[in-house]
Amino acid sequence: MSCPYPFKVFSCTVSRHSHQAACVVAKTQATSQPRGALSPGGGFLAALALSVTGWRIGSKGHIVAQKTSTPPPDTIQAGDMITDFDQYLLGEGTHRQLWRVLGAHVQDDATHFAVWAPNARAVSVTGDFNGWSGTEMTAVGQTGVWQVRIPGVGDGALYKYQITDANGALREKADPVGFGAQHPPEQASVVRDIRGYGWRDGAWMETRAEAADRAAPISIYEVHLGSWRRKWDDGGRPLSYKEAAQDLVGYVRHMGFTHIELMPISEFPFDGSWGYQPVGLYAPTIRFGPPHEFRDLVDAAHAAGLGVLLDWVPGHFPTDEHGLATFDGTHLYEHADPKEGFHQDWNTLIFNYGRTEVRNYLVANALYWMEEYHLDGLRVDAVASMLYRDYSRDEGQWVPNKDGGRENLEAISFLQEMNVAVYGADASVMTVAEESTSFPGVSQPVHTGGLGFGYKWNMGWMNDTLSYMALDPIHRQHHHSQMTNPIMWQYSENFILPISHDEVVHGKGSMLEKMPGNDWEKLANLRAYYGYMWMHPGKKLIFMGCEFAQPGEWSHDGDLNWDAASRPAHAGVQALVRDLNHLYRDTPALHVKDCMPDGFAWICNDPAQSTLGFARFGAAGDAPVVVMCNFTPVERVAFRMGVPTPGEWDEVLNTDAAAYGGGNRGNLGGVLSEPTPCDGHAQSVTLTLPPLSTVVLRLKD
């Protein structure tokens, strides 16, 4: 007989009918328990408790618990957290809330420890609570997980796992799912009670979907917390999370940005990696404070109307002995073959995305940051290195996929799974891919074959336009297409225009140093470029310091040159970026159709004069915007350009304004169109284009 009443196991609907099942398990809010035995016909009888050692999927896809003739050893102590259903999910590698089971969990009078080490001969917990002598852990069924509950251990305790591998060798490891860690170079994990934080961001959480929408203005301030500002009167230390909650949040709000993007804060041993070589994916770095203070930072940002994105690194991990490498004596998280598992550029190890438990470890980590820390999105690092098996490898140094190709099919599948899980859990967040190739469909839905990201960095736009701006203006006429061609692929993805930390390090120079000419021309070039960038379709991202034209490259060992920011020329660029943000946010035509081709139209392009003009459009009834850029140091007087609509056009921004450090040449606040055909339009306006400038006009209401 069939049963018409299915029940839910997470997002999968499972029928109560299976002829092969000895027991079917349902997930409840409190625990997971057998619902009842099945009659020979498949119907439910009274509830019957069974000893469960394993799980399988029945022939029709039903979740089945298998009964054994003898009960398993009593390996689970009273008060342990791992339920039968947890065991099933752990065994299958599909536990989306992995952090609620593994790691160190503070209870009333004890701490429960659990770690996945399936190939270990034995595992112990060693810490400052047992004289670092080791407390034996017990295996949990067939899951590969070991656990123990230790009375008297609480928040702040130091611990490591002592893992005896199959050959009898002893390894000391930090907790892969630890919520805290010692300050590097110390390597122990730290018990952190992350329960019960008093969030005050309910209003933000209810409406944040609007801030992530493709039609919303998104302007992101990328930050390296350790070097944004330092306390030089206190030994040169970086700001704490709590101090950043006041100083950083206040500054970003004042500057008109919509989001803060934090470079990686998952615990990492080497400062020089900037966080891109993490060992503690579940632990906010202690460099700036404990976990609850990181929550204070996020809570403060939300109170200020700012979203918080985290730079997330699922592509690789370092070889540090206390980390994930050969965790239980085997290549547990990484590939055994270095042609698949070793990243030659960074001397790091690559996750084995073909292993279900490893995928689950990473997917659960993405969900963890959203759920436990209320983050509003993830920027996924180095996606290109994940997508291709031959990435940065010579011939013969990589292993083809099962079809003989170069694509990393397992990584592609993992990224799709991650995006489906993240958006499935909370559609109000965003995921962003740093992807530098032409891999198709990065920000397209998974069900259409895409990777499922919300947005993708437009690395091509960044490379082309910065290359153009570095040229002496006399040569720009021969490279005009570098400023115009990017629009040809602008709508193939949901793009963010990025000026990131990678562009101001390793000898590339600061944004100001990239610009040609004398000091005045450098600043004018940069102002014109920022005007072009903010008016161009696509969401915006800029790295800290670039907003005030920091004179030199960024260094993680110091902080930003705030002295320069106080000088008039640099303060002018800072004021420009603030005004660009507010204009972008307040003008629907500049953001509503960032990702739609009918929101943009070319008006004029003159390579010989290095000028270009375009229009931006919003929804019906939104005032259109016209943008004109002059990338030569020559003033253009009585410059005529077509406009899409007759009427009075306000000059809402001019990068040559005196307030920004310019020469204050312009159009006296606005122009009136004339019935003189130009550039294919029946109406046109006559403009003064200052040298090295961007002028923005908006149709007067």
From Swiss-Prot:
Role according to the record: Catalyzes the formation of the alpha-1,6-glucosidic linkages in glycogen by scission of a 1,4-alpha-linked oligosaccharide from growing alpha-1,4-glucan chains and the subsequent attachment of the oligosaccharide to the alpha-1,6 position.
Record-linked SUPFAM superfamilies: (Trans)glycosidases, E set domains, Glycosyl hydrolase domain
PANTHER family with a match to the protein in the record: 1,4-ALPHA-GLUCAN-BRANCHING ENZYME
Pathway: Glycan biosynthesis; glycogen biosynthesis
Family: Belongs to the glycosyl hydrolase 13 family. GlgB subfamily.
Cellular component GO terms, alphabetical: cytosol
Coiled-coil residues: none
GO molecular function terms listed in the Swiss-Prot or TrEMBL record: 1,4-alpha-glucan branching enzyme activity; cation binding; hydrolase activity, hydrolyzing O-glycosyl compounds
GO biological process: one example: glycogen biosynthetic process
Protein name: 1,4-alpha-glucan branching enzyme GlgB
Enzyme class name: transferase
Enzyme nomenclature, EC number: 2.4.1.18
Taxon lineage: Bacteria, Pseudomonadati, Pseudomonadota, Alphaproteobacteria, Rhodobacterales
Pfam families to which the protein is assigned, alphabetical: Alpha-amylase, Alpha-amylase_C, CBM_48
Family annotation (InterPro entries): A-amylase/branching_C (IPR006048), Branching_enzy (IPR037439), GlgB (IPR006407), GlgB_N_E_set_prok (IPR044143), Glyco_hydro_13_cat_dom (IPR006047), Glyco_hydro_13_N (IPR004193), Glyco_hydro_b (IPR013780), Glycoside_hydrolase_SF (IPR017853)
Keywords: Carbohydrate metabolism, Glycogen biosynthesis, Glycogen metabolism, Glycosyltransferase, Transferase
Gene3D superfamilies: Glycosidases, Golgi alpha-mannosidase II, Immunoglobulins
Reaction(s) the record says it catalyses: Transfers a segment of a (1->4)-alpha-D-glucan chain to a primary hydroxy group in a similar glucan chain
Active site positions, chain numbering: D381, E434
Quaternary structure note: Monomer.
